[in-house]
């Protein structure tokens, strides 16, 4: 796992590596957040910035791990229908694309 680590007073902030899969219908972001679950994860969008924060039950040098990551979203993302879930220490966020972002083929005659 490629991570950037920062210390603050109570938490060890970790920038988790992200896997991004993009297709015609959606983009899917997966982040490794071991020790976190649905109750300790926050996902929000403000001003086209997707922010994710996950508190882990794990500690490092006596400090609780806090995973944080943000992404700039394009106008193609349907913000109202973003979904997120955690399973086996992985946070998966699905970013559906809006209808206007989908490719419409025009038949040439």
How would you describe each model-predicted region?
Residues 1-109:
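Alpha-crystallin/small heat shock protein
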